[in-house]
Amino acid sequence: MNFQEFRNKWFDLGCISPDQIYSWRPDFDKNNISNWSKKGLIIKLRNGFYLFPEHKTRSGFAFYVANRIYRPSYISLHSALAFYGMIPESVVQITSVTSRKTATFSNAIGEFSYKTIKPDLMFGYDVKPIDEGHSFLLAKPEKALIDLLYLYPFYNTKFEIEELRLDMDFIQNDLNKNLLKEYSKQIDCKALEKRVKLII
């Protein structure tokens, strides 16, 4: 198989794994992946996941990659807060939560960070389309905030909350406070409920 045939088959998918390739061509030579990666024809994201470089700068595609290379997961915490304009800082890492163990990956796309939460706390996210065939899972604003307060318990005073530099216009006018309270109660953590009250 030459690279052009490979590209024609998998380019639209964007992020691919050898398992997918072997299901298509059981006799596929795994050395092709290594050779094409060395030539820059594909980008290694982590063991078992590759990306065509043309997708590297596509808007929103880094979030799609984040979902793909470590499942199950969804974009949350600082990346989600920045996406909604709730915090002013640009976020260097792409932050997600997962029911798997905490992990980080660094590649040509960026740095990906995953924080562990319990499987029954994997809720409160939406499917965000990028284009036809590509989408990513993103925490709702309320769940991104809940995930942050749950995973970073040092945000337990007014001063620490202020250090987040949350957009108060968003908090007052756009944040669904009833949903925030509902998520907090669903997690059933008294310390978390106290931290939520510092915001609302």
Which stretches of residues belong to each language-model region?
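Short beta-edge/loop segments at beta->alpha junctions of small alpha/beta modules
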Residues: 1-72
